[in-house]
UniProtKB/Swiss-Prot annotation:
Top-level EC class as recorded in UniProt: oxidoreductase
GO molecular function: preQ1 synthase activity
Primary gene name: queF
Protein name per its UniProtKB record: NADPH-dependent 7-cyano-7-deazaguanine reductase
Function, in words: Catalyzes the NADPH-dependent reduction of 7-cyano-7-deazaguanine (preQ0) to 7-aminomethyl-7-deazaguanine (preQ1).
EC nos: 1.7.1.13
Subcellular locations according to the entry: Cytoplasm
Residues where NADPH binds: 94-95, 262-263
Biological processes per GO annotation: queuosine biosynthetic process; tRNA modification
Superkingdom of the source species: Bacteria
Amino acid sequence: MTHNHDPYSDAKELAGLTLGKATDYQAEYDASLLQGVPRSLNRNAINLTAESLPFHGADIWTAYELSWLNAKGKPMVAIADIQLSHESQNLIESKSFKLYLNSFNQTKFDNIDAVQKTLVQDLGECAQGQVTVKIIEPKSFGIQRVVELPGTCIDDLDIEVSDYDFNPDYLENSTDDKQIVAETLNSNLLKSNCLITSQPDWGSVMIRYQGPKIDREKLLRYLISFRQHNEFHEQCVERIFVDLKHYCHCTKLTVYARYTRRGGLDINPYRSDFEHPGESHRLARQ
């Protein structure tokens, strides 16, 4: 269970981030612009250790504003799909990622493979973990799809809400042990706030589980309770996963959130104890 105490207020690892500060934009390649945040900051607070994580998965990023110069100086553009392993020591702070990608804008690369290899090397070094990068060229833009999350949307439930403070206790006594089900639910009402700037982060979340049937109204109240909660996207998804395992006793569980983009980047954390992410397709709000 993950009650809302603040593990971040004294975290020296956050003090040096460019996030929330005035920033000069560099247009020439500089890998040092990337900044990582230790995953342990959040995981310690929800009683997780790197040696015994209850899930696997990835932080799935889409970079829509990737541009560089080819060997002749002509601008090139692409989209990048990036997957960062859940086992990496650090998550990548998104503003630093944006600044890093901007540094490609006036930098010459011999070919697209050189761009891909540079991204893999730099992101892996910052995150201290495994990274995969797929670069999508303009000739393939037309096949990029907009999809809906799988499952049954719970947002039309007619509930009255007056409390918007994060509270995992909404999941207390939320299951029916006499009904063992396998189902997929989703909501577009996920909103949290940036840990540093408190800017709103808008997202949709899919929950696929097997186990005692979860009361959908209680689940929706729980998700709505993130509305004024300050935490990075990746941390929110891991918190949801841990809370559902604790309160709802899911025997199998996947939590997959897709957040709207900011600065040309969207972040889509995926955590599961029984399946792996498939192709990454954006939602309408992304």
